[in-house]
């Protein structure tokens, strides 16, 4: 039996069977292969995805330019610039230590240099920095480029919900898809088997030879990292954001030692509310994206068995401390994304007058921010909770 980390020449894509792909390598009308790929972001997950891409571009030279540029936010580590360490030692010692990177992966500290001539842009940065990055890129990339967002989350305000790929698309005028799944970066970097989902509907201006599902499959698929390409960006994006609220509810149950049956109840109810939310605010999203894809139920399961949101809620239940207190103690100044998402979702559904349609989301918010007892969760599962009920915090 072949180890999944060893040679995969027997299963790599046969590029000779693919159409010759022409594309833009400058801002002129000249079209010629292969695709040039740049990764924007070099953190734990960003470096892992860049490693995968560099492995695949090296094996598919007719389809991709072999050199992959990865934008690195320059910082000093152990007396040297991080980009220099990556380029000389082929290891990201700060964010992905111990993992050897392909020598065709090049760290570039200048953002515009990193994306110059690129046809495929991979966004993999903390979403709070997205606007700043987009403002620097605007007007400086090929307008015919395509993009994939590896960011998980939504932009929520009182009026509605925006998908992060749509924000990228609107800012840069380029078509953007999404990649998400049950993908713990360290496990993927160590070449342990996992799956992921790519959401990418073909753009309205698609022509033969453009980036399509085959190209994206070839770019991301590895023997240890299996890829399924679908068209539902909204379903993948909703699942990636809402899972963190559900992980908090499961963490509450774990902290109170209610057992596996109770955790299963939270997962079941959370999955249903996740689907309902997606269908309500993005009617075109597919139920199958939540129930069949790695970006849906698989990522939900992984998030609800560990991670910072689960751990925060577990400690809250065990100690009686507030979310703010626990966050300060265990996250070293960082934020648990589930807290932010829970508040944003509450404000949205309250503004839309549909709190009672999402009792798990609403109750989790009330526990986090208004001192409601965690013990109300079983009552919530009977769908009797609403903000007009008596005060359950005493």
Swiss-Prot record:
Transmembrane segments: none annotated. NAD(+) binds at residues 41-46, 152, 185, 308, 337. GO terms for cellular component: cytosol; nucleus. GO terms for biological process: carbohydrate metabolic process; glycerol-3-phosphate catabolic process. The active site is at residue 243. Pfam families: NAD_Gly3P_dh_C, NAD_Gly3P_dh_N. Keywords: NAD, Oxidoreductase. It catalyses: sn-glycerol 3-phosphate + NAD(+) = dihydroxyacetone phosphate + NADH + H(+). Its EC number is 1.1.1.8. Substrate binds at residues 152, 308-309. PROSITE patterns: NAD_G3PDH (PS00957). One of its GO terms (molecular function) is NAD binding. InterPro entries: 6-PGluconate_DH-like_C_sf, 6PGD_dom2, G3P_DH_NAD-dep, G3P_DH_NAD-dep_C, G3P_DH_NAD-dep_euk, G3P_DH_NAD-dep_N, NAD(P)-bd_dom_sf. Coiled coil: none annotated. Gene3D superfamilies: N-(1-d-carboxylethyl)-l-norvaline Dehydrogenase, domain 2, NAD(P)-binding Rossmann-like Domain. It is an enzyme of class 1 (oxidoreductase). Belongs to the NAD-dependent glycerol-3-phosphate dehydrogenase family. This is Glycerol-3-phosphate dehydrogenase [NAD(+)] 2. It comes from Cyberlindnera jadinii.
């Amino acid at each position: 039996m072949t180890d999944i980390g060893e040679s995969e020449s027997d299963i790599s894509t046969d590029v000779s069977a693919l159409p010759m792909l022409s594309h833009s390598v400058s801002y002129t009308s000249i079209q010629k292969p292969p695709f040039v790929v740049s990764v924007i972001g070099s953190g734990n997950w960003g470096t892992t995805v860049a490693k995968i891409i560099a492995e695949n571009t090296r094996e598919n030279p007719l389809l991709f330019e072999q050199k992959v540029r990865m934008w690195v936010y320059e910082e000093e580590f152990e007396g040297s610039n991080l980009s220099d360490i990556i380029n000389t030692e082929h290891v990201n010692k700060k964010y992905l230590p111990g993992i050897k990177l392909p020598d065709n992966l090049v760290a570039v500290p200048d953002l515009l240099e990193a994306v110059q001539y690129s046809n495929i842009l991979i966004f993999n940065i903390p979403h709070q920095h997205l606007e700043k990055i987009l403002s620097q890129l605007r007007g400086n990339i090929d307008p015919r480029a395509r993009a994939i967002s590896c960011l998980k989350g939504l932009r929520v305000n009182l009026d509605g919900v925006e998908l992060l790929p749509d924000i990228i698309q609107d800012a840069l005028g380029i078509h953007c898809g999404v990649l998400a799944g049950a993908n713990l970066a360290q496990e993927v970097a160590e070449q342990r088997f996992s799956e992921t989902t790519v959401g990418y509907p073909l753009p309205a201006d698609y022509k033969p030879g453009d980036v399509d599902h085959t190209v994206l499959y070839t770019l991301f698929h590895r023997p240890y990292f299996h890829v399924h390409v679908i068209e539902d960006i909204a379903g993948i994006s909703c699942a990636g954001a809402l899972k963190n609220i559900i992980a908090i509810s499961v963490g509450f149950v774990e902290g109170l030692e209610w057992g596996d049956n109770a955790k299963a109840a939270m997962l079941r109810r959370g999955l249903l509310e996740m689907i309902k939310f997606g269908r309500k605010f993005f009617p075109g999203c597919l139920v199958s994206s939540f129930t069949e894809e790695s970006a849906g139920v698989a990522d939900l399961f992984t998030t609800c068995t560990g991670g910072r949101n689960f751990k925060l809620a577990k400690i809250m239940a065990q100690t009686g401390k507030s979310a703010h207190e626990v966050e300060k103690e265990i996250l070293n100044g960082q934020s648990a994304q589930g807290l932010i998402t829970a508040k944003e979702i509450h404000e949205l559904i309250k503004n839309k007058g549909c709190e009672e349609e999402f009792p798990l989301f609403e109750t989790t918010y009330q526990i986090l921010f208004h001192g409601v007892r965690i013990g109300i969760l079983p009552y919530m599962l009977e769908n009797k909770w609403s903000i007009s009920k008596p005060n359950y915090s005493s």
